[in-house]
Regions:
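N-terminal cap/lid segment of alpha/beta-hydrolase-fold proteins
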Residues: 16-56
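Mobile cap/lid helix-loop segments that gate and shape the active-site cleft of serine hydrolases
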Residues: 20-26, 39, 159, 167, ...
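Catalytic nucleophile-loop/oxyanion-hole region of alpha/beta-hydrolase
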Residues: 35-36, 74-83, 95-135, 268-273
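C-terminal catalytic histidine-bearing segment of alpha/beta-hydrolase fold enzymes
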Residues: 45, 107, 236-287
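Short substrate-entry loop that stabilizes the transition state in hydrolases
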Residues: 52-59, 65-106, 148, 188
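Acidic catalytic loop of the alpha/beta-hydrolase fold
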Residues: 186-187, 230-234, 264
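Short beta-strand/loop motif that positions the catalytic acidic residue
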Residues: 219, 225-227, 231
Length: 287
């Protein structure tokens, strides 16, 4: 009966209109404050279907990356809860992660945020048997600063200087697809970032290296880019810039501009239910 309820919930989640997910239902299991980094530093929350999955059926997994300008934010923010819950309702294991923020260490923290998020992918692969996931089917989604990080995970590889130095043998950080919610594509055209440890004028190279658009000419994992026209924090032109660079490179991507949507929306902004779009994209590349 519980499995039937899960199947019905998953099917219902694909159809609009549906009441916004604001609380975690009993059909979703959440494990909080899981250690995934060396030492007792950043932690993660795991969302998964509560219904038992047959041993032969491995779940796809998605890393969720919070925003906050690389200065603040948390894995347990409302947007991340909404995304994690909706993913679990649709048959995914979702891992909402924290990463090093500006001010937590002396000087610059970059590229620490990228490395932490890539280590989350490594942790999923290392623990795939215990988690019941397919290590070949891992995606990523993030909003704002998290969107920037999601795009970097999709676009960068071993030669780009973002790989953790302590990678286990036979384990890599590649993701199969990424969803970038209103992320910064070109840091040089945005504003100075505390995480970089210098201004754009003083060290333009670090800003260029931290910009997803820098890597758009490479072979990339498929990207879904979402941005609202009412965003006053990150100009929608940032997403258009990344989409154009990906188009010019012949990379698989989709740009969706949502009229009237502000910054920090989740999968269910009042302007449009984005679950069919986002879940459909993930299903195509991870199932």
């Amino acid at each position: 009966m519980l499995l039937l309820q899960m199947l019905l919930a998953s099917e219902a989640c694909r159809q609009a209109p549906i009441r916004k997910v604001e609380q975690i239902p009993d059909s979703v299991l959440v494990q909080r404050d899981i250690r995934f980094l060396p030492g007792d530093t950043e932690k993660a929350d795991i969302y998964r279907p509560a219904a038992q999955t047959p041993a032969a059926k491995k779940l796809p997994a998605v890393v969720i990356i919070h925003g906050g300008g690389f200065n603040s934010g948390d894995k347990g923010n409302a947007r991340e809860i909404n995304i994690g819950t909706n993913l679990a309702l649709n048959g995914y294991l979702a891992m909402s992660v924290n990463y090093v923020l500006a001010g937590q260490k002396e000087g610059k923290t970059w590229p620490g945020p990228v490395l932490d998020c890539k280590r989350a992918v490594v942790w999923l692969r290392e623990n795939s048997e215990k988690l019941g996931i397919d290590p070949r089917r891992i995606g990523v989604i993030g909003g704002s600063a998290g969107g920037t990080l999601a795009a970097l995970l999709a676009l960068t590889g071993p030669c780009d200087g973002f790989e953790p130095a302590d990678l286990p043998p036979g384990i890599d950080t590649r993701v199969s697809c990424a969803v970038d919610l209103y992320g910064i594509a070109d840091m040089l055209t945005h504003h100075d970032m505390r995480t970089m440890g210098a201004s754009r004028e003083a060290d333009p190279a670090i800003y260029k290296k931290g910009s997803p658009v820098t890597y758009a000419a490479k072979i990339a994992s498929p990207l879904l880019i979402l941005h609202g026209t009412a965003d006053k924090t990150v100009d929608p032109e940032q997403s258009r810039l990344l989409a154009k660079a990906l188009k010019d490179a012949g990379a698989e991507h989709e740009l969706v501009i949502i009229p009237g949507a502000p910054h920090t929306f989740d999968l269910q902004p009042k302007q449009r239910d984005l679950r069919p779009l986002v879940i459909g994209f993930l299903d195509r590349h991870l199932k």
